[in-house]
């Protein structure tokens, strides 16, 4: 990159994944977060803009603090990349912060931690107000058992049992630093903090935890499932509705703001 001409910017954005067919641009022109964002950025930059994201999300998966970087020759003030871009974005996406960063900053490769929350409604009837906002099960769940199982995720492990068949990660070995499971007002929250995640990993974990909570899988069975390192014996992938990317960790020197998780979530 010619640093004399180009600037590198990092932006933090939030989006409603139910409105888009995932993050990545697609050849058939269906609405995606990346396509909408790059179109809006181009309006402000006056030139084509290509973005690099911290972590791609699937159809239906949300983000409260996704991080993206892009290069541009356009000299614009910081607010142009926030308010200006937001004026050109469709409903369901908003830029929260923008910051000019060092030319070597990389949204994906410089990230050393990622945070996800899965919001699950446990109720006999699914609330129409939570559709697309939370996963749902009609089953009564034993939160204590689920919490014990979730604790087994912490540490560096081979998570092949929770890996999608189409996952392109070079290694299934990842490190989970924190796995907290709580419940309030009929909503279960699974918070995971790890160095990186496999494709569908969080949704597959939630699917297995629901099996534990409903008595279809014991805590010991959950532990054995991890050790099996095979997707073949694992419970089905859970729905995307309740999955949120809630933060990305970067070295402090880059000054990337990680917003707090919204209180409503």
UniProtKB/Swiss-Prot annotation:
UniProt key word Magnesium: no
InterPro entries: PsdUridine_synth_cat_dom_sf, PsdUridine_synth_TruA, PsdUridine_synth_TruA_a/b_dom, PsdUridine_synth_TruA_C, TruA/RsuA/RluB/E/F_N
EC number: 5.4.99.12
Residue positions of the active site: 58
Tagged with keyword tRNA processing: yes
Binding site for substrate: 116
Biological process terms in GO annotation: tRNA pseudouridine synthesis
Top EC category: isomerase
Name of one Pfam family that matches: PseudoU_synth_1
One GO MF term: RNA binding
Keywords, sorted A to Z: Isomerase, tRNA processing
CDD domains found in the cross-reference section: PseudoU_synth_EcTruA
Catalytic activity line of the entry: uridine(38/39/40) in tRNA = pseudouridine(38/39/40) in tRNA
Subunit structure: Homodimer.
UniProt function note: Formation of pseudouridine at positions 38, 39 and 40 in the anticodon stem and loop of transfer RNAs.
Similarity comment: Belongs to the tRNA pseudouridine synthase TruA family.
Name of this protein: tRNA pseudouridine synthase A
This protein's encoding gene: truA
């Amino acid at each position: 990159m010619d640093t004399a001409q180009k600037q590198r910017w990092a932006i933090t954005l939030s989006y409603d994944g139910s409105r888009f067919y995932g993050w990545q641009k697609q050849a058939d022109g269906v609405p995606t977060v990346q396509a909408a964002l790059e179109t809006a950025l181009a309006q402000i930059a006056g030139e084509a803009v290509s973005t690099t994201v911290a972590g791609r999300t699937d159809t239906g998966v949300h983000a409260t603090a996704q991080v993206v970087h892009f290069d541009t020759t356009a000299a614009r003030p910081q607010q142009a990349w926030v308010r200006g871009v937001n004026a050109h974005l469709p409903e369901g996406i908003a830029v929260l912060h923008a910051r000019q960063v060092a030319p070597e900053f990389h949204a994906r490769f410089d990230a050393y931690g990622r945070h996800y929350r899965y919001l699950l409604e446990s109720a006999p009837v699914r609330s129409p107000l939570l559709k697309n906002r939370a996963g749902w099960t009609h089953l009564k769940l034993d939160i204590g058992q689920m919490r014990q199982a979730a604790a087994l995720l912490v540490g560096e492990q081979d998570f092949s049992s929770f890996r999608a068949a189409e996952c392109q990660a070079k290694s299934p070995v990842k490190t989970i630093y924190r796995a907290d499971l709580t419940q309030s007002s009929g909503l279960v929250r699974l918070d995971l903090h790890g160095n990186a995640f496999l494709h569908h990993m969080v949704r597959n974990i939630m699917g297995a935890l629901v099996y534990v909570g409903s008595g279809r899988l014991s805590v010991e069975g959950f532990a054995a499932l991890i050790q099996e390192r095979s997707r073949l014996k694992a419970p089905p992938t859970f729905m995307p509705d309740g999955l949120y990317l809630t933060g990305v960790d970067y070295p402090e020197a880059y000054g990337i703001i990680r917003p707090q998780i919204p209180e409503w979530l």
